[in-house]
Structures are given as structure tokens and as C-alpha cells.
Amino acid sequence: MAQAVNLCYGQRKYAQQGWFEVDVRKEDVTAPDVIALLQDHLKSMTMHSPPESIHALNADRLRQPDVTFWSARENGILLGCGALKELNSRHGEIKSMKTSPHHVRKGVANRILRHMLEEARRRGYQRISLETGSMEAFLPARRLYEKAGFQYCDPFAHYKEDPNSLFMTLNIG
């Protein structure tokens, strides 16, 4: 079910333009604009991380039954995406968070994250975890998760210690 939410554009020039409506909904990962955004996501991972440290899911993996994939759109235009992977009945993992390069700093990632956390609570998850990069390029993502209350933690699920990865978790139960 789609949800429309008003978001402030932020403190850049967009703030002068007012509010915009974002529709966060389950999405087909085979949509051409989604495929392009996911390819951009994977490309940016390869620019900043060695291959053994890239844990992003490809489109085939995002279609598996244990993964729910959402897009954020404004008037049909893709702004960003994110996915929630079920690790078990009480624990989920955030995957494939990506904002379109044309829509960064507008609150898109925050809106997708809030939507996924609401869904995780609805499912009865007690904890949400994630893996992100340790390099400077991933600082905006880490700040987003820190502001949402995520704490740094040890590797979880199948992950192992990696100097290129940081792990975060949020208790929501």
C-alpha cells in the first residue's frame, strides 16, 4: 500500500520551493529506472570498496521472498530505493539504500528508512541491522543511521570483521 508523506526539501535552495509529496511503495525491481538506480548503486560500491567488501544485493537477489524492495517517487519520478531483508522472525537487515544523484539532500533516504522501520515494527521485528562502508564516501549514510538511533555493533548474520565495513543495529521491539 502506498503512503504519501510531505517532506521538507532541507536547508538548500529546495527549501524555498516548499514541500513535496513522496510516495513510498513496494516496487518491481525490473522497472527500467529502478534497474538504472541499482546499477548506479553497484557501480558506486565498486568505486569505494574492494570486491570482497561489497555486500550489495543485485536485482535477482532483491526479488527473493525474504526481501521486500521499496521505491520513493514524486509524481512518478524515482527518487530513491531501499530494501528490508528478513534474517529471522525477529531480526531484519536494511539493504540497497540509494538516493538518486539528482535528489540527494532532500530527505529521501530518511523517508525510506522511516518507512522500512515502520514496516519492521509491523512485522514484529525486535531488531534491525545493517552493514555500510567505513570509508569517507559512506559518511552521509552513517550519519543518517546514527540520527535514526542506530548504534555500532559487531558483525551479525553471515558477516565477518572487515576493515572496509561497519555494522550498526537498532532495537525496535
Name every feature range the model reports, one short phrase each.
Residues 3-4:
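Intrinsic, low-complexity polybasic segments
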Residues 67, 163-167:
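Short hydrophobic/aromatic beta-strand or adjacent loop that forms the aromatic wall/cage
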Residues 100, 133-135:
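Residue-level recognition of the GNAT/N-acetyltransferase active site
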Residues 120-133:
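Conserved GNAT acetyl-CoA-binding A-motif
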